[in-house]
Amino acid sequence: MDKRNLRSKKTIKDALILLSSKKAFIDISVHDLCREAGISRSTFYNNYHSLNDVVAEISSEYMEKIRGKNLNREFFESLTRDGNELKLLVETGVFGREFSFYLKDLMAGDDSKVKRGTRDDVLLNIKTLYHAFGVFGVLQNLSRMYGSSYYEAFRSEAIDTLMELSGTLSKE
């Protein structure tokens, strides 16, 4: 892929993340995205088929970033730095699905898909992960039912709670 396409894709992804911080994903159109990114619709369609394709690529890149992180405090701290990106992935339901696949690979011992970490790490932190998915489910439902203002109001508090749980449970 040439530099121009890479630059266009980055611009599109950045614009979608920014737009998703302003309104719900379901309310974003390709037209809105193109206007925000300062690109033509043909540029968008030369790179993606739909907004869901953009989300899928953002998700793949995000999962690549978090693979290999320790599945406790380090992991949850990384979530606080990726607010708008994570909001988009949680709102669309992609984060939970992709993270579930990652855990499945980890538990199955498919080390080709897991950079660092062991099945023992997951087993030791299974309570933390259980609570994490519960909190992410609540955030996802709040976002869908009430919009992003509720999500933003509870996200940092939820992450703090997860980090606290992680610290407590990892001592058990």
Regions found by a protein language model. Give the residues of each.
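Basic, helix-initiating cap at the start of DNA-binding domains
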Residues: 1-23
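Amphipathic alpha-helical packing segments from all-alpha helical-bundle domains
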Residues: 94-139, 159-167
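C-terminal peripheral helix-coil segments that are non-catalytic and often amphipathic
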Residues: 144-172
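Hydrophobic alpha-helical connector segments
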Residues: 67-96
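Short, basic, alpha-helical segments at the C-terminal edge of helix-turn-helix-like DNA-binding modules
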Residues: 29-30, 58-69
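Short hydrophobic/aromatic patch on the recognition helix
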Residues: 38-47
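Short amphipathic alpha-helical segment with a characteristic S/N-K-E followed by hydrophobic residues
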Residues: 12, 27, 50-55
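The alpha-helix within a helix-turn-helix
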Residues: 34
